[in-house]
């Protein structure tokens, strides 16, 4: 069938298998061009199919020669219905890893569940023995608690005040003001339950108890801090409450791993177009401005540049780039005072008329479609493609 993009709000409901494969190949080519680094050899990535998690898997495998186990929740293509981008990304990753003799195994299921944790542990025990790095890169709208069965939904809201903030309606391509009511205490608690550090901690405890964490094993979870412009909706809002929970829980996890020479760190990455970030009301406008300013400065980076740099500069470097809270920082180019000042200066100047002139909304749209395998150079989008692409060595839970 011929697959075209169908966008609904902040999600594209179709994905292109060939486009996704080329995307993955370009990321592999990038990390190889940076040369190998002395990094992890057996890696578990929780949330491995898109965005930063996928980049973490690619960099570990193709620049450090790691065997990888990936956990994700994606949908395969069936009949004339395309699968999700994450499915096609993972199929491509497996294909390229296998071609180079790199071990790759994946688990498709709910990472919050005990069943998926157990299945993952069984695979590690059987095939790898242990892992020396666990990357936690999960973005999910809801979580069923594995012990109580309670379902929590996350919300994107400010805390303690109504927020009036400029935003960009990406469908209509107009600037509009978003009015967002503050979260209730229950909404805050639910968001922390979904996006905080409890599940990360549960994973590490389960892996540790099963004896599949190697001596000296490291773990990292990804976060975003941002600057003043994004603080009200992000760092000082419900998502921020969840991210602050990560900062608390990492201390306990670090203590647990340090006993055997290991370490646990929260890693701060830059703002990027991902399926997760496009859902945040003011993010498309912020990103469109940020892209414009950073590209002009020559400091713009995508997922793969960020994560590959995180491995080389911090996770596997004797002199990691770290802040006073002990977080690894890969977002310093975004937060450079001159970059932020220019974004802030342009923020109120953007109108419907000058949107394409003052911002890089064109680049934003292009990056958004690329997430789903569209608008990738060298791909024939009129060609017939089979939406059913198998993933070898996949366990369905």
Swiss-Prot record:
Pfam families: Eno-Rase_FAD_bd (PF07055), Eno-Rase_NADH_b (PF12242), Enoyl_reductase (PF12241). InterPro entries: Eno_Rdtase_FAD-bd_dom, Enoyl-CoA_Rdtase_cat_dom, FabV-like_NADH_b, Trans-2-enoyl-CoA_reductase. Keywords: Fatty acid biosynthesis, Fatty acid metabolism, Lipid biosynthesis, Lipid metabolism, NAD, Oxidoreductase. NAD(+) binds at residues 47-52, 73-74, 110-111, 138-139, 243, 272-274. Substrate binds at residue 224. The keyword Oxidoreductase applies. The record marks 74 as: Plays an important role in discriminating NADH against NADPH. Pathway: Lipid metabolism; fatty acid biosynthesis. It catalyses: a 2,3-saturated acyl-[ACP] + NAD(+) = a (2E)-enoyl-[ACP] + NADH + H(+). It comes from the Bacteria. The keyword NAD applies. The active site is at 234 (proton donor). GO terms for molecular function: enoyl-[acyl-carrier-protein] reductase (NADH) activity; NAD binding; trans-2-enoyl-CoA reductase (NADH) activity. Its EC number is 1.3.1.9. One of its GO terms (biological process) is fatty acid biosynthetic process. Gene3D superfamilies: NAD(P)-binding Rossmann-like Domain. NCBIfam families: EnoyACPredFabV, PRK13656.1. Monomer. Involved in the final reduction of the elongation cycle of fatty acid synthesis (FAS II). Catalyzes the reduction of a carbon-carbon double bond in an enoyl moiety that is covalently linked to an acyl carrier protein (ACP). Belongs to the TER reductase family. This is Enoyl-[acyl-carrier-protein] reductase [NADH]. It comes from Methylobacillus flagellatus (strain ATCC 51484 / DSM 6875 / VKM B-1610 / KT). The gene is fabV.
């Amino acid at each position: 069938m011929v697959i075209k993009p169908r966008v609904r709000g902040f999600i594209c409901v179709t994905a292109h298998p060939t486009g996704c494969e080329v995307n993955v190949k370009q990321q592999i080519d990038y990390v190889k061009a940076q040369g190998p680094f002395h990094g992890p050899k057996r890696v578990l990535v929780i949330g491995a199919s898109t965005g930063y998690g996928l980049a973490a898997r690619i960099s570990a495998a193709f620049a450090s020669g790691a065997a990888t186990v990936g956990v994700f929740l994606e949908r395969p293509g069936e009949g004339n219905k395309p699968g999700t981008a994450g499915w096609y990304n993972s199929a491509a990753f497996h294909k390229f890893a296998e071609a180079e003799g790199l071990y790759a195994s994946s688990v498709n299921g709910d990472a919050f569940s005990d069943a998926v944790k157990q299945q993952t542990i069984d695979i590690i025990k059987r095939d790898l023995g242990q892992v020396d790095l666990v990357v936690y890169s999960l973005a999910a709208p809801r979580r069923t608690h594995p012990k109580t069965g309670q379902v929590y939904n996350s919300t994107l809201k400010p805390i303690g005040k109504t927020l009036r903030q400029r935003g960009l309606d990406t469908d209509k391509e107009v600037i509009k003001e978003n009015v967002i009511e503050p979260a209730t205490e229950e909404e805050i608690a639910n968001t922390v339950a979904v996006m905080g550090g409890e599940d990360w901690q549960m994973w590490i405890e389960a892996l540790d108890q099963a004896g599949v964490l190697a001596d000296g094993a490291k773990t990292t979870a990804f976060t975003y801090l941002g600057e003043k412009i994004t603080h009200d909706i992000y760092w000082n809002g419900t998502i921020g409450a969840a991210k602050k929970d990560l900062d608390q829980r990492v201390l306990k996890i670090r203590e647990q791993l340090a006993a055997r020479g290991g370490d646990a760190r929260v890693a701060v990455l830059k703002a990027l177009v991902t399926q997760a970030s496009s859902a945040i009301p003011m993010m498309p406008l912020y990103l469109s401005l940020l892209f414009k300013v950073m590209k002009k400065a020559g400091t713009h980076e995508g997922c793969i540049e960020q994560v590959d740099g995180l491995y080389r500069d911090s996770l596997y470097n004797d002199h990691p780039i770290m802040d006073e809270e002990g977080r690894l920082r890969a977002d310093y180019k975004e937060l450079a005072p001159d970059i932020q000042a220019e974004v802030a200066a342009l923020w109120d100047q953007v109108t419907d008329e000058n949107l394409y002139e003052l911002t890089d909304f064109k680049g934003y749209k292009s990056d958004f479609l690329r997430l789903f395998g569209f608008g990738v150079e060298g791909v024939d989008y009129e060609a017939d493609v089979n939406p059913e692409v198998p993933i070898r060595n996949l366990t369905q839970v």
